Structure formats: structure tokens, C-alpha cells
């Protein structure tokens, strides 16, 4: 019995017929699959690394992120109050129990880490193999407008990615310039995300946000959405 693979093993003595070791005797194990198991594990690890790298490459290519957020992680988020520490724990629970359907709305004053925690969630979920995307809504709408001059193909590609990812973060919603076109485009995005996990961040209150994005979009946003309030000191200026 092989201790490595728990398979019945038969040992046979063979004589090397040719080469510099001709005539030497060797003992071989028949039935041992340790090398097969090792190869399978190495292949599995290589495929996982390839998939994870591809997810990260796509995330970096399609996401619209401020440079200040690129190094953000759940580990380097330092809450400035007991309440914000509770929010950090809630985020960890969300990551550990991610079901692909539950939405979050981070709301509160500037500088409490809404965007920091949101992008941290995407990084942790990508480690688990989920497809994620982080988009600043004002930047997204600006980019889509520019795409009109280059033909609809590029816009369609981006909207397809938005539709397909397991988690979409829409950052800074409500701060975009409000026009009939932007309101319609936001509804299109929200409609495409129906039934899929989306995280929203905003500095606005619920009444202010409803007024900014209109009642129809606000109602669609709030479907299966947990509101997470993040008020406190601006952690980016804690040393100022």
C-alpha cells in the first residue's frame, strides 16, 4: 500500500536493457498514482493562476478607477470610529457569503472609505474566481459619450462586460451631470444588472439620491439592496 496515494502497489525488479546503465537493476512501483496526483494538482494550480490573472487583466482594462484607489485593500482600510469598524466587519461577511445577488448601497459623508471598501470587495472576490468591475459613474458616462464618435461597437463591448460580471461597483452615483440622456443610460445599466450583485456608493442621502437619479432609477437600485451608512471623520485627512 502506497502511503502517498493509498493505492495497492506491486514492486517489480527490472533490468535496464540499453544505455550507460545497461544491466543495472531498478525497482518500479506498479499501481502508484502519486505522480498523477501531483501533476493534477500542479495543473489545477496553473489553471487557477491563469484564470485569476485573466480576471485581474480584464478588471484593470475595463474599470474606471482613480489612482488613489488602486492600492486599496480590506487590510489597509483603517476605520476612524466604532461604527465604521462595524461596517468593515459587514464587508467581510458580505465577501464570505457572496451569493451573486445581494446589492449594497454605501452612503455617507466624504472620506469615510466607501470607495475603498467597495474596490476591496472586488479584489477579494476576484481571488475566489468571480468576475468584477469597478466604474466611476461620471467617468463611465463621459467615456460612453466619447465612444459615440468612434462607433457603437466599443460601447456595446463595455455594456456587455457590465451585463456579464458577477459584481459591478457603481461609484459616486448621483454626482454625474443630470440630463435626460444620462438618466436613460443609467436605467439601461440598472436594468441589465437586474438579479446580479451591484454595489453603489454615494455621498447623498436617500431623498437627495432619489431626486438626482429620478424615482424609477432609485426604485430599481433599491431592489434587494442593503443600505450601509458610513458617516464619520475623513480618514484621508486624519493626519492633517
Give residue spans per PLM region.
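Loop/turn-to-beta-strand initiation segments
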Residues: 102, 130-131, 164-168, 194-200
Amino acid at each position: 500500500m502506497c502511503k502517498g496515494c493509498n493505492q495497492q502497489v506491486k514492486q517489480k525488479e527490472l533490468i535496464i536493457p540499453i544505455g550507460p546503465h545497461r544491466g543495472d537493476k531498478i525497482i518500479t512501483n506498479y499501481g502508484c498514482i502519486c505522480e498523477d496526483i501531483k501533476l493534477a494538482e500542479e495543473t489545477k494550480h496553473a489553471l487557477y493562476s491563469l484564470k485569476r490573472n485573466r480576471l485581474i487583466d480584464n478588471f484593470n482594462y475595463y474599470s474606471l478607477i482613480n489612482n488613489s484607489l488602486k492600492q486599496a485593500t480590506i487590510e489597509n482600510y483603517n476605520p476612524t470610529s466604532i461604527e465604521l469598524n462595524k461596517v468593515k466587519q459587514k464587508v467581510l461577511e458580505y465577501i464570505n457569503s457572496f451569493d451573486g445577488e445581494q446589492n449594497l448601497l454605501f452612503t455617507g459623508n466624504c472620506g469615510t472609505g466607501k470607495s475603498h471598501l467597495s474596490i476591496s470587495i472586488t479584489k477579494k472576490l476576484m481571488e475566489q474566481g468571480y468576475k468584477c468591475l469597478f466604474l466611476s459613474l461620471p467617468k463611465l458616462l463621459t467615456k460612453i459619450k466619447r465612444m459615440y464618435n468612434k462607433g457603437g461597437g466599443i460601447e456595446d463591448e463595455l455594456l456587455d462586460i457590465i451585463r456579464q460580471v458577477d459584481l459591478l461597483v457603481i461609484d459616486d452615483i448621483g454626482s454625474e451631470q443630470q440630463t435626460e440622456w444620462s438618466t436613460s443610460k443609467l436605467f439601461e445599466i440598472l436594468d441589465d444588472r437586474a438579479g446580479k450583485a451591484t454595489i453603489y456608493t454615494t455621498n447623498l442621502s436617500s431623498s437627495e439620491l432619489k431626486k438626482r437619479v429620478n424615482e424609477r432609477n432609485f426604485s430599481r437600485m433599491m431592489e434587494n439592496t442593503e443600505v450601509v451608512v458610513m458617516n464619520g471623520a475623513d480618514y484621508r485627512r486624519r493626519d492633517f
